[in-house]
């Protein structure tokens, strides 16, 4: 008799994706983040579902309903802080996952990569709308500033913004629709994850050498299931430490004040995981130019496969490209820091320099360095 996991239509899919999947024998811990992202998504959907049972998406009661969750609901504070800090863990894993893809040339699987970029946009949109829901000061003003950016689009901008707002300012209609979309998007993300995995399993995983590993594969279970469990335990340990000891470390104190349209906070800034893009937006004096730079800072990932000029796929044996990669990583940290600073003298010029460097490394320096390395390899 055939094993049920190999014959049952549903079990067969799970078996071919998680158990008998052939995986390269040499993939490192940088390949753990895919599974961690899946677990983060499941955690966010689960905690979000329970939070939605107690939350009210009305401007008069939203802030109080979040307070009610924290004070009166059994373990409501755990749910709320798991959800808020879970988003931070999600983005840490997401950025490391993208960084891994850039370093090891995983973007050469273009379909998987492009679906991944769409996923990144979807997760960013979901996180932005989620930040608006507690209806604190930073929620309200963050929503006002970011949605207002669409008014920079010529001709249709103003109408587009009012259409998104559902009125002439960020108000009750905006909050209600943001809640609806914030609830819906994670399920769309789940479907996109399936597509992402479908494309990945068409080609198989890349590995640190960047060389095809068809001749040396091992089953996913038990080798990589055990490895993923270790990564999961480490992530949960970090997340629980954050939630139980310092839940507000990554948040903004202004969001503990109810939204007040008559009082603008001195420094409007998004959550830490958007600060690098926010810094790029602010570094361009022109509104439309800033919006374009903001969108391109993420959309540029789509053209990465076209900019690959090296004869080698991975950066493992390309020290010059490695230097540029880590310069890019440092530059993104600098942009994140700048995004959280006020718009005044030293920070403006640093932000502009870091923004120019960001685009220069990706569009000009990386492809040129790869060509130089190709030439050096001939010697």
From Swiss-Prot:
GO BP of this protein: mitochondrial electron transport, ubiquinol to cytochrome c
Q: Which GO terms describe its molecular function?
A: metal ion binding; ubiquinol-cytochrome-c reductase activity
Question: Could you give one GO CC term from the UniProt record?
Answer: respiratory chain complex III
Membrane topology reported for the UniProt record: Multi-pass membrane protein
Q: What residues bind a ubiquinone, as annotated?
A: 201
Record has Repressor as a keyword:
no
Tell me which residues bind heme b b562: 83, 182
Q: Which CDD domains match?
A: cytochrome_b_C, Cytochrome_b_N
Q: Which UniProt keywords apply?
A: Electron transport, Heme, Iron, Membrane, Metal-binding, Mitochondrion, Mitochondrion inner membrane, Respiratory chain, Transmembrane, Transmembrane helix, Transport, Ubiquinone
Q: List the disulfide bonds.
A: none
Q: What cofactor does this protein call for?
A: heme b
Q: Per the UniProt record, which residue ranges are transmembrane?
A: 33-53, 77-98, 113-133, 178-198, 226-246, 288-308, 320-340, 347-367
Cofactor note text? Binds 2 heme b groups non-covalently.
Q: What subcellular locations does the record give?
A: Mitochondrion inner membrane
Show the InterPro entries listed in the entry. Cyt_b/b6_C, Cyt_b/b6_C_sf, Cyt_b/b6_N, Cytb/b6-like_sf, Cytochrome_b, Cytochrome_b_C_euk/bac, Cytochrome_b_N_euk/bac, Di-haem_cyt_TM
Q: Which residues bind heme b b566?
A: 97, 196
Q: Which domain of life is it from?
A: Eukaryota
Quote the subunit structure annotation.
The cytochrome bc1 complex contains 11 subunits: 3 respiratory subunits (MT-CYB, CYC1 and UQCRFS1), 2 core proteins (UQCRC1 and UQCRC2) and 6 low-molecular weight proteins (UQCRH/QCR6, UQCRB/QCR7, UQCRQ/QCR8, UQCR10/QCR9, UQCR11/QCR10 and a cleavage product of UQCRFS1). This cytochrome bc1 complex then forms a dimer.
Any other noteworthy remark? Heme 1 (or BL or b562) is low-potential and absorbs at about 562 nm, and heme 2 (or BH or b566) is high-potential and absorbs at about 566 nm.
The role this protein plays is: Component of the ubiquinol-cytochrome c reductase complex (complex III or cytochrome b-c1 complex) that is part of the mitochondrial respiratory chain. The b-c1 complex mediates electron transfer from ubiquinol to cytochrome c. Contributes to the generation of a proton gradient across the mitochondrial membrane that is then used for ATP synthesis.
The family assignment reads: Belongs to the cytochrome b family.
Please identify the protein, giving its name as recorded.
Cytochrome b
**Protein source organism:** Myotis capaccinii
Q: Which gene encodes it?
A: MT-CYB
């Amino acid at each position: 008799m055939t094993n049920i996991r190999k014959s049952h239509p549903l079990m067969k899919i799970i078996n071919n994706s998680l158990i008998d999947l052939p995986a390269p024998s040499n993939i490192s811990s940088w390949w753990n983040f895919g599974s961690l992202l899946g677990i983060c998504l499941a955690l966010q959907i689960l905690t979000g579902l329970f939070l939605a049972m107690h939350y009210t998406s009305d401007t008069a009661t939203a802030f109080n309903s979040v307070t009610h969750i924290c004070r009166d609901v059994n373990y409501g504070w755990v749910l709320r802080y798991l959800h808020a800090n879970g988003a931070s863990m999600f983005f840490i894993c997401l950025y490391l996952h993208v960084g891994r893809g850039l370093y090891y040339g995983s973007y050469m699987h273009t379909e998987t990569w492009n679906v991944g970029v769409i996923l990144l946009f979807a997760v960013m949109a979901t996180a932005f709308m989620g930040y608006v829901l507690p209806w604190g000061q930073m929620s309200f003003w963050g929503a006002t500033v970011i949605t207002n950016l669409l008014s920079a689009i010529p001709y249709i901008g103003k109408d587009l913004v009012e259409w998104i707002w559902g009125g002439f300012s960020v108000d009750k209609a905006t909050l209600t629709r943001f809640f609806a979309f914030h609830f819906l998007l994670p399920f769309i993300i789940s479907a996109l994850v399936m597509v992402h995995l479908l494309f990945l399993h068409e080609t198989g995983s890349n590995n640190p050498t960047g060389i095809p590993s068809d001749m040396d594969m091992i089953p996913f279970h038990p080798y990589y299931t055990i490895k993923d469990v270790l990564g999961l335990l480490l992530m949960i340990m970090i997340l629980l430490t954050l939630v139980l000891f310092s839940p507000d470390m990554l948040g903004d104190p202004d969001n503990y004040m109810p939204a007040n349209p008559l009082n603008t906070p001195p420094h409007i800034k998004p959550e830490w995981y958007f600060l690098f893009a926010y810094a790029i937006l602010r570094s361009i004096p022109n509104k439309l130019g800033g919006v374009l730079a903001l969108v391109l800072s993420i959309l540029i990932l789509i053209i990465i496969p076209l900019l690959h000029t090296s004869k080698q796929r991975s950066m493992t044996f390309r020290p010059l490209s490695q230097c540029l990669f880590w310069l890019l990583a440092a530059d993104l940290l600098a942009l994140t820091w700048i995004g959280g600073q006020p718009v005044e003298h030293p920070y403006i010029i640093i932000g502009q320099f870091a923004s120019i460097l960001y685009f220069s490394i990706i569009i000009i320096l990386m492809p040129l360095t790869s060509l130089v390395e190709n030439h050096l390899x001939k010697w």
